[in-house]
């Protein structure tokens, strides 16, 4: 896969230099950018997420979530992915729970029906709400109070 571009958002919690370096490895199959929009933080992912780069995906999602303050949300746009293994869904579900405890929604963006089918089959559709576009995910209001 091609070179990864990671743009840390200008916030008190940018992505770590180590993560930016690892994502920038020319042999990495994961591409990602982060961007802020008001209180929201967006991750735009491309390439592939599988067992070989699950650790990078988890670190990216965790570090990005740490930079979001309530009410957020954290929006993860996976429309640029060619492959999204089950490990990617598990990482998102784990982080969604941590975000909910902080009063932040994690919202997944995909227009691919298979993403919704996998989330539904894995029992994750309530944990990972899926929106067809970033704009619709941004327009859904706030998470409200923390709920663990």
From Swiss-Prot:
<dbReference type="InterPro" id="IPR003658">
    <property type="entry name" value="Anti-sigma_ant"/>
</dbReference>
<dbReference type="Pfam" id="PF01740">
    <property type="entry name" value="STAS"/>
</dbReference>
<feature type="domain" description="STAS">
    <location>
        <begin position="30"/>
        <end position="141"/>
    </location>
</feature>
<dbReference type="InterPro" id="IPR002645">
    <property type="entry name" value="STAS_dom"/>
</dbReference>
<comment type="similarity">
    <text>Belongs to the anti-sigma-factor antagonist family.</text>
</comment>
<keyword id="KW-0346">Stress response</keyword>
<dbReference type="GO" id="GO:0043856">
    <property type="term" value="F:anti-sigma factor antagonist activity"/>
</dbReference>
<comment type="subunit">
    <text>Interacts with unphosphorylated OprA.</text>
</comment>
<protein>
    <recommendedName>
        <fullName>Putative anti-anti-sigma factor Rv2638</fullName>
    </recommendedName>
</protein>
<dbReference type="InterPro" id="IPR036513">
    <property type="entry name" value="STAS_dom_sf"/>
</dbReference>
